[in-house]
Amino acid sequence: MTNKNQFNGLLLVDKPSGISSHDVVARLRRILSTRAVGHSGTLDPMASGLMACLVNEGTKLSQYILEGDKGYRLRAQFGIRTDTLDTTGETLETRPTDHLTRELILSEALKLQGEMEVEVPIYSAIKVQGKKLYEYARGEQEVTIPKKVMKFWDIEPVEIGSDWAEFDIKCSKGSYIRTWIDLLGKALGCGAAMSGLRRTWSSPYKIDQAQTLEQIEASVKGGSLGPAFVPMELALPQVKRIRIKGQDKVLLGNGQISHDLRSQLISAFNPDVDQYIQVLAQEGGELLAVIGLEPGRGFVLRRVFKYS
């Protein structure tokens, strides 16, 4: 494949720590010679791990990829509180950790499972009255910090030291690991800050499917995107699919749902479990559209994909 602009789909990138998510996107734009690159979820500069990046027509999949749950390996430093809830921030307080034991740390960590409504970090991009929270923090302006329902589960200890611990954890989209660590520090009575974070899972993708930017660049120079590339038709394995051909396909390309396609949708769509259905070509298998069901409107085209 010689034209890099022909690539459509996802790139699973193993982001290094020390650079921003925007830096990753900018690097991919240079590698792929296209502006049409985005991502499906920000990772803080100090964090590493899986970023699902979207290329060309793949950028239209952003909202569907964003909805997935996430998995992380975190490292918590006990005995410290900072303004950013991680060790890059300004230290607000230090406390002794002599009372900590492995059993106590693990016991309190496992209590922090399930749904909870908690304040979001002040250093976050959540907007209040049209302004990002971190802008209030940097300007030392008062603001009421909103609360958000977050969900954490599958908490597994990796290693626990005298004043630190590593855990594997899963969470709902939009949940903050920094907040979970802060809650753990409060439960232990000594405070805690995030000192390391690696995203290992962004449903339905895992970190072992990803490649570094250097590996991706080498693959592209060799004429492909390598194993980290996920084509459009495989990008949403969790979404039910149906296939069409002939006039149904022609009409869909013009933004119309044919009678036969509507009949297929009625048979396939289960409103109790399905949010969307993806429509693929019978021949060739390319992803043609994503269709949803809206009350009072019936089946609606959410996305139609065009390939040059």
From Swiss-Prot:
Catalytic reaction equation(s): uridine(55) in tRNA = pseudouridine(55) in tRNA
The record ties this protein, via Pfam families, to:
TruB_C_2 (PF16198), TruB_N (PF01509)
What are its GO biological-process terms? Answer: mRNA pseudouridine synthesis; tRNA pseudouridine synthesis
Q: Which UniProt keywords apply?
A: Isomerase, tRNA processing
Write out the catalytic residues in the record.
Answer: 44 (nucleophile)
Q: What is this protein's function?
A: Responsible for synthesis of pseudouridine from uracil-55 in the psi GC loop of transfer RNAs.
Family designation: Belongs to the pseudouridine synthase TruB family. Type 1 subfamily.
This one is known as tRNA pseudouridine synthase B
The record lists the organism as Bdellovibrio bacteriovorus (strain ATCC 15356 / DSM 50701 / NCIMB 9529 / HD100)
Query: What's the gene?
Result: truB
